[in-house]
UniProtKB/Swiss-Prot annotation:
Protein name, per record: RNA chaperone ProQ
Domain of life of the organism encoding this protein: Bacteria
Protein function: RNA chaperone with significant RNA binding, RNA strand exchange and RNA duplexing activities. May regulate ProP activity through an RNA-based, post-transcriptional mechanism.
Biased composition (Basic and acidic residues): 117-136, 147-177
SUPFAM superfamilies listed in its UniProt record: FinO-like
Molecular function in Gene Ontology: RNA strand annealing activity; RNA strand-exchange activity
Renumbered residue ranges of the record's region Disordered: 105-182
Gene name per UniProt: proQ
Subcellular location as annotated: Cytoplasm
Length: 232
C-alpha cells in the first residue's frame, strides 16, 4: 500500500474512476447521470486504493458533476447509474431544471469573461498606438534656384487651390454610470446594467442571493453578478 502512486489532482482522480468504473464514469464525451448517494459507494469500493482520501473523492465528484458534458447529460428521460452501470431510476424534473440553469450560468460566465478579455485587448492596442512625439527629422536644404536675369519675363505663379479646413467631429460623450453600493436596496424587476470591461449591458434583477445578484440580460441569458460589476 505504501508503494502505491498518489493521485494529485481531481482530473487524475476522475481518469482513475473512469478506468476503474467504465460503465459509470467517462473521461470524455457526454457523461451519464450518477446515482444519488454514489459518494458513499465510492468510499466503500475504493477505500485505500491509490491512497485516495474522502476529500479527494468529494472534490473529484464535484468537478465531474459540474462539468458541461455532465450537465448536458442531465436531461429528461435520462437514467441514473451506479458504479457498475446498473440503472437507478430516471431523473426528476427538478434535477433536470437545476442542471439546465447551472449550464446557462456557466456559459454566461464564460461569455462575460471573453467580453472582458476582448475589451482589455482593445484597450492595450489603443494604448500601444499612442506613441510619444517622434523627434523631428532634419530638413534637407532647399535647392537654390538661379536668379532671374534682368529683363527676362517673369512667369505667373500658379495659384494653389484653397483647402477647406476639415470640420472637427465632436467625440461622443461617455455615458456616466453610478455603481451599485448596496445590493439589498435592489428590487426584483429593477433595470440596471452589467459591466463587462468598458461596456455595460442592460439587465433586469431576477433575485438577490448571498453570492450576488441574479440578473437577466436582454438576450434572455441569466447569471449571478457581484455588486462591483453592477451599475445604474
Amino acid at each position: 500500500m505504501e508503494n502505491q502512486p498518489k493521485l494529485n489532482s481531481s482530473k487524475e482522480v476522475i481518469a482513475f474512476l473512469a478506468e476503474r468504473f467504465p460503465h459509470c464514469f467517462s473521461a470524455e464525451g457526454e457523461a451519464r447521470p450518477l446515482k444519488i448517494g454514489i459518494f458513499q459507494d465510492l468510499v466503500d469500493r475504493v477505500a485505500g486504493e491509490m491512497n485516495l482520501s474522502k476529500t479527494q473523492l468529494r472534490s473529484a465528484l464535484r468537478l465531474y458533476t459540474s462539468s458541461w458534458r455532465y450537465l448536458y447529460g442531465v436531461k429528461p428521460g435520462a437514467t441514473r447509474v451506479d458504479l457498475d452501470g446498473n440503472p437507478c431510476g430516471e431523473l426528476d424534473e427538478q434535477h433536470v431544471e437545476h442542471a439546465r440553469k447551472q449550464l446557462e450560468e456557466a456559459k454566461a460566465r464564460v461569455q462575460a469573461q471573453r467580453a472582458e478579455q476582448q475589451a482589455k485587448k482593445r484597450e492595450a492596442a489603443a494604448a500601444a498606438g499612442e506613441k510619444e512625439d517622434a523627434p523631428r527629422r532634419e530638413r534637407k536644404p532647399r535647392p537654390t534656384t538661379p536668379r532671374r536675369k534682368e529683363g527676362a519675363e517673369r512667369k505667373p505663379r500658379a495659384q494653389k487651390p484653397v483647402e477647406k479646413a476639415p470640420k472637427t467631429v465632436k467625440a461622443p460623450r461617455e455615458e456616466q454610470h453610478t455603481p451599485v453600493s448596496d445590493i439589498s436596496a435592489l428590487t426584483v424587476g429593477q433595470a440596471l446594467k452589467v459591466k463587462a470591461g468598458q461596456n455595460a449591458m442592460d439587465a433586469t434583477v431576477l433575485e438577490i442571493t448571498k453570492d450576488g445578484v441574479r440578473v437577466q440580460l436582454n438576450s434572455g441569458m441569466s447569471l449571478i453578478v457581484r455588486a462591483e460589476h453592477l451599475v445604474f
